[in-house]
Amino acid sequence: MRMSFGLTFKRTAKVHWRANFSQQCSLRSTGLFVPPSPPLDPEKVKELQRFITLSKRLLVMTGAGISTESGIPDYRSEKVGLYARTDRRPIQHGDFVRSAPVRQRYWARNFVGWPQFSSRQPNPAHWALSNWERLGKLHWLVTQNVDALHTKAGSQRLTELHGCMHRVLCLDCGEQTPRGVLQERFQVLNPTWSAEAHGLAPDGDVFLTEEEVQSFQVPSCSRCGGPLKPDVVFFGDTVKPDKVDFVHKRVKEADSLLVVGSSLQVYSGYRFILTAREKKLPIVILNIGPTRSDDLASLKLDSRCGELLPLIDPR
């Protein structure tokens, strides 16, 4: 069950936004959104190596913390997460579905942020997990991220728990469209539209003024004329039951669980930690800062994912 079909990663045509956003994003500092962490503890690295060596059916769950080193911020990290830097909050599912103006605002902001968000590339942590899969160490990978970076790194035994921003769905007929194709439709409908944006979010959102949003034209489904929504689980929505059941089965098949870059504050991911605990699986957590499940972990590491994971030999 690979949840990553229908992706294209070509760069889209140039869009009209003012220089300060593109210059800001072009810095691509890998440390911009990564919280400070202590130096690697050699003894803990050895413990993680021992854990991986003994694991025969390892399940890995990743969160936003694995992608901060690729230049995509997370929500909750102290000082550098979206919640710490701004008073903005993610869009709510009910608001998006019910309100055309909310959808217009969302898509205008997403249109501006898309070229930078979609151009982000995997970092050493993504490549390490892909290599673990290739060498037969990884039983399954569950990501809470919507950035497609695991897919770009070549991971195939993958479930995108919250969907993927690289796909768009019609709310009426379910027609699926690659996000890059929709970007071209946006450009055709808004040939002279421009905006000044600030602050990329974990889902590719940026911040615009209401005046900039009001003139933005949003296309409808090319098949039925219905409203379009990214194929992701917005806040206030729930993961589909069949996907939850699928991941529960993968957890029950596993003999160990590694959490990478997640505070586990969201129940959609935390519930699988509870399943692992019920099954008495050893749990290791790699995340800078406290998590909801630190008391359940046999080992907790506060290190950069891209610094630590490549040091581990999966064989």
UniProtKB/Swiss-Prot annotation:
Transit peptide: 1-29
Pfam family, one: SIR2
EC numbers, comma separated: 2.3.1.-, 2.4.2.-, 2.3.1.286
Coarse class of the protein's main subcellular location: mitochondrion
Location(s) in or outside the cell: Mitochondrion matrix
Organism for this UniProt entry: Bos taurus
Protein name: NAD-dependent protein lipoamidase sirtuin-4, mitochondrial
Cofactor note text: Binds 1 zinc ion per subunit.
Binding positions for Zn(2+) per the UniProt entry: 170, 173, 221, 224
Gene that specifies this protein: SIRT4
InterPro entries noted in UniProt: DHS-like_NAD/FAD-binding_dom, NAD-dep_sirtuin_deacylases, Sirtuin, Sirtuin_cat_small_dom_sf, Sirtuin_class_II, Ssirtuin_cat_dom
